[in-house]
Amino acid sequence: MTEMSFLNSEVLAGDLMSPFDQSGLGAEESLGLLDDYLEVAKHLKPHGFSSDKAGSSEWPAMDDGLASASDTGKEDAFSGTDWMLEKMDLKEFDFDALFRMDDLETMPDELLTTLDDTCDLFAPLVQETNKEPPQTVNPIGHLPESLIKVDQVAPFTFLQPFPCSPGVLSSTPEHSFSLELGSEVDISEGDRKPDSAAYITLIPPCVKEEDTPSDNDSGICMSPESYLGSPQHSPSTSRAPPDNLPSPGGSRGSPRPKPYDPPGVSLTAKVKTEKLDKKLKKMEQNKTAATRYRQKKRAEQEALTGECKELEKKNEALKEKADSLAKEIQYLKDLIEEVRKARGKKRVP
């Protein structure tokens, strides 16, 4: 029971020391697998760890946690003791080859080293993501909190020291490497800086459907076969150039160029142009008709004025003749009167 309580307290200490969020799917799977191993260790106490190995661990600061965990483990293990009275022939089973007890003995040291190395590896990344990014580095704006949480949860899959958990492959701008189960990770300072820049300038996949890179383009694949078959891509080549990225303010204001206008717009434009043409033609016809009418009226007026002048001239000539005739008539009347007077004087002597 000391070995079982040691494993339980060790995992609890690893959970407390890890700076990552344990609410992801990888954390739940690892805890479920750890529970399976603990159940196996309960029923295999004679074949478990020795007390010497359990006492020689490198956990001097966790005495209180080990004592409390051992008390709870005893209560859980000896709550029902009926299984201890059963007799079974265990010679048929080779538990060393079946459950890999050697791996279980070496698991605490490897888990401790991987936890320390990964904590040191991702500590500067968490500090840089918590800081405010400079305005010149991130052209898209502040990343949503959900992406940061996913990045913090994803590295926990590297810490699964179980034979049945899949390995995770990752790539950096300089080189690509695979993390084996329980292996140590050593990355220099030069390799950490490009990784932090990649976390800051990560393009969200919801910006545009055409710009979403595939798993091979991003340099991350889930299986070794797909990783070996795909060509190596760096984050600088997999991303689209900044000229092709739509600006956050101009993407909504400027619509896409369309190959053709909508039918309603073309019909209305044609109708408007036809109406304008008809109006212009009518205006020109009215102008020409008005000018012709004015010309006719002017010609008629000129003809009438000419005739009137001629008639006036004739009238004046006729008046002169009438005056002359009236004068002659008056002169003749006067002569006739004088002749009558002369004849009357001659008759009266």
Swiss-Prot record:
GO biological process: bone mineralization; cellular response to amino acid starvation; cellular response to glucose starvation; cellular response to hypoxia; cellular response to leucine starvation; cellular response to oxidative stress; circadian regulation of gene expression; circadian rhythm
Xref: InterPro entries: bZIP, bZIP_sf
Keyword Nucleus attributed: yes
Effect of residue 254 to A: Does not affect phosphorylation by RPS6KA3/RSK2
Disordered: region residues: 49-75, 204-271, 279-298
Chain intervals for the UniProt region annotation (Interaction with GABBR1): 303-339
Effect after changing residue 218 to A: Promotes stabilization due to impaired ubiquitination
Signal sequence range: none
Compositional bias annotation for Polar residues: 229-239
Effect recorded for residue 230 to A: Promotes stabilization due to impaired ubiquitination
Family classification: Belongs to the bZIP family.
Protein name (Swiss-Prot/TrEMBL): Cyclic AMP-dependent transcription factor ATF-4
Organism: Mus musculus
Name of the encoding gene: Atf4
